[in-house]
């Protein structure tokens, strides 16, 4: 089983603004979000298939707890409440499908894939994909 545990620092980010645009976030909020999320700190704790992920930026901190294969409550990147279902897509990759609790919006998901000491986080909203690469601290 892959070990996602540790603290992670972002090395690169592609298409974050485009993702926020696809989610319908207005220009002013996008500018704030892009600036705030330019240097996130991520802490992951793992016990088998149970995960705790804390992501801290200058504007907000999010925490999620989940067990692979069990639905949990989460918020989309733009803060809407959703039900999320994480599954193993491959030996080193978790895919989490998100379903909005209310209202309409793009189909969203995230994946986290471990490649040695690099963690690739992908956010998706319909056909728009944001890729962020992290390295262990």
Curated annotation (Swiss-Prot):
Gene Ontology MF terms in the entry: retinal binding; retinol binding
Chain positions of motif Nuclear localization signal: 21-31
GO CC annotation terms, alphabetical: cytoplasm
Coiled coil location: none
Alphabetized Pfam families for the sequence: Lipocalin (PF00061)
Compartments where found: Cytoplasm
Entry binding sites for all-trans-retinoate: 132-134
Entry text on domains: Forms a beta-barrel structure that accommodates hydrophobic ligands in its interior.
PANTHER family: FATTY ACID BINDING PROTEIN
Stated family: Belongs to the calycin superfamily. Fatty-acid binding protein (FABP) family.
Name assigned to this protein: Cellular retinoic acid-binding protein 1
